[in-house]
């Protein structure tokens, strides 16, 4: 079982890997304001994604989870590398820079923050009243407290930030089809997951304007089997 929030970038990281490996699993969408109760079996982790094996064993934290799933169901092939230093460096880069860029692109402006929270309220599992409360009360928090601070600290517009990051990512891939070479590896799927998490929102069009980034993105997407 994979416990998720539909709009959580960390959940999308794991979902892409599972779809690529064609692993059958049940997907459980958690109520966004009841995660502590619904994930009580995690002994205090209380964050998505959570992977639970049939024997009840629980895996948490998206990147270690991806490595463990690859190890158990794919003999660790997607984490194997001839250049482990490069692999580790760029997995850390993806988890640091792409993670921090997701909130600014979705909530970096007042209007975009409102559009995002309304969209989230429709995609996530909320109760009748909590859905409406989140849609209209959530965006000032996400925009005013979190996103504006990150945008101000970075100094770039969210679109420019993403295009700069995609330039850096694609430059590292170079002439290869994927970061992993001729086939995607776990670093590819981690980066793909962060970008894919933006796809349900209108702001994704700003990323689609980056030609090289979208060429790579579509290549990874084409490897998904589920």
Predicted features along the sequence, with ranges:
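Conserved alpha-helical elements of sugar-nucleotide-dependent glycosyltransferases
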Residues: 9-13, 200, 212, 216
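Alpha-helix C-caps/helix-loop-beta hinges
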Residues: 48, 75, 175-176, 192, ...
């Amino acid at each position: 079982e994979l416990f998720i929030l539909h709009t959580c970038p960390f959940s999308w990281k794991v979902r892409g890997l599972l779809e690529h490996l064609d692993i059958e699993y049940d997907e459980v969408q958690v109520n966004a304001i009841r995660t502590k109760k619904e994930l009580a079996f995690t002994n205090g982790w209380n964050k998505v994604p959570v992977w639970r094996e049939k024997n009840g064993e629980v895996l948490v934290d998206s990147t270690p989870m991806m490595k463990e799933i690859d190890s158990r169901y794919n003999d660790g092939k997607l984490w194997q590398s001839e250049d482990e230093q490069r692999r580790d460096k760029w997995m850390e880069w993806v988890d640091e820079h792409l993670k921090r860029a997701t909130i600014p692109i979705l909530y970096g402006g007042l209007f975009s923050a409102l559009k995002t929270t309304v969209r989230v309220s429709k995609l996530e599992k909320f109760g009748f009243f909590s859905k409406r409360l989140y849609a209209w009360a959530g965006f000032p928090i996400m925009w005013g407290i979190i996103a504006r601070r990150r945008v101000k600290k970075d100094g770039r517009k969210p679109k420019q930030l993403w295009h700069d990051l995609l330039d850096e990512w694609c430059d590292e891939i170079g002439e290869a089809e994927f970061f992993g070479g001729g086939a995607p590896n776990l670093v590819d799927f981690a980066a793909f997951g962060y970008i894919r998490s933006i796809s349900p929102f209108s702001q994704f069009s700003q990323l689609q304007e980056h030609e090289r980034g979208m060429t790579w993105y579509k290549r990874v997407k084409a490897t998904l089997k589920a």
